[in-house]
């Protein structure tokens, strides 16, 4: 995995550093950086959380990231769900995601494990880590992490208690996708008749707008073949219904045999009969997979990997 997820397009998109027993693991996508923190159990006594400071070398900015949990005793008047600096109210979790990252930016994150007491924090251990987000315009790899937080306070702050379908102009779906679905659309839409073909293997295959896009692409003359899971009622029936509604049955093969689920989620793009790129990752071709669950998509422009 290190060969794929290490250095890409001249930058580092995955990095792990350890100092004084404090380990930080960071993985960058195109619009997000994911973090995992590890501190020896013996050092966790009195731990209050983690402060995250970010230097944006691309835009020459420097600041602490914000979060929405705070210490009641030192709350300056914030209401539940409001944002505050992690300098004073550190993150109370061993994993975090910076969804304010921008494509093609170079960042230095300094993560500090804080002890002491609310209002008088004492740094216990600190790790600085350099990372670069992917740029869709260059390189052989693009990685997309959706937000996948339909039930989170961040969603409620922006859209209230409304379901994504009830938010005007699809803005809730755009926010939840964080570029993932748009990249999926582009992967399919960039095909041309007589030059490209698509080979799709799917487990959940029932997001109607995506199937509609595939039908339109097929109607343009692009060769498309699809195999999807139909071993059991779920997701088999949803898949069958969606395929019929999209008029894609002629391009599909139903996987009905086997003792295991066909948990596939990839698209191979062929150019002049040869595999040239692949869309893969953990994202099902369903509304829940694309917008609801926390998921990742990885586009690899490499003939050998695509094959």
What is each residue range found by the language model?
Residues 3-136:
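Low-complexity, Ser/Thr/Pro-rich intrinsically disordered linker/stalk segments at domain junctions
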Residues 111, 123-196, 201-307:
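HKD-type phospholipase D/PLD-like phosphodiesterase module
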């Amino acid at each position: 995995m290190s060969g794929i997820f290490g250095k890409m397009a001249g930058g580092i998109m995955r990095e792990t550093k350890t100092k004084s027993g404090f380990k930080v693991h960071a993985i960058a996508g195109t619009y997000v950086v994911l973090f995992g923190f590890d501190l020896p159990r013996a050092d966790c006594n009195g731990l209050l959380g983690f402060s995250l400071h970010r230097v944006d070398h691309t835009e020459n900015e420097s600041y602490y990231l914000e979060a929405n949990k705070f210490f009641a005793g030192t709350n300056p008047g914030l209401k539940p769900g409001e944002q505050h600096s992690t300098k004073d109210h550190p993150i109370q979790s061993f994993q975090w995601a910076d969804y304010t990252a921008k494509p093609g930016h170079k960042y230095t994150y300094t993560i500090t494990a804080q002890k002491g007491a609310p209002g008088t924090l004492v740094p216990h251990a600190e790790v600085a880590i350099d990372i670069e987000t992917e740029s869709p315009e260059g390189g052989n790899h693009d990685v997309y992490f959706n937000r996948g937080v339909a039930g989170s306070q961040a969603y409620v702050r922006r859209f209230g208690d409304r379901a994504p379908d009830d938010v005007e102009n699809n803005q809730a779906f755009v926010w939840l996708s964080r570029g993932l679905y748009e990249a999926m659309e582009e992967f399919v839409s960039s095909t041309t008749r007589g030059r490209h073909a698509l080979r799709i293997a799917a487990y959940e295959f029932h997001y109607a707008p995506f199937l509609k896009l595939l039908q339109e692409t097929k109607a343009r003359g692009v060769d498309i073949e699809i195999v999807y899971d139909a071993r059991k009622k779920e997701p088999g029936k949803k898949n069958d219904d969606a395929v019929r509604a999209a008029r894609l049955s002629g391009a599909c093969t139903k996987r009905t045999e086997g003792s295991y689920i066909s948990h596939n989620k990839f698209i191979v793009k062929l150019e002049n009969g040869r595999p040239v790129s692949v869309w893969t990752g953990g994202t099902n071709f369903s509304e829940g997979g694309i917008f609801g669950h926390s998921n990742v998509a990885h586009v690899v422009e490499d003939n050998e990997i695509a094959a």
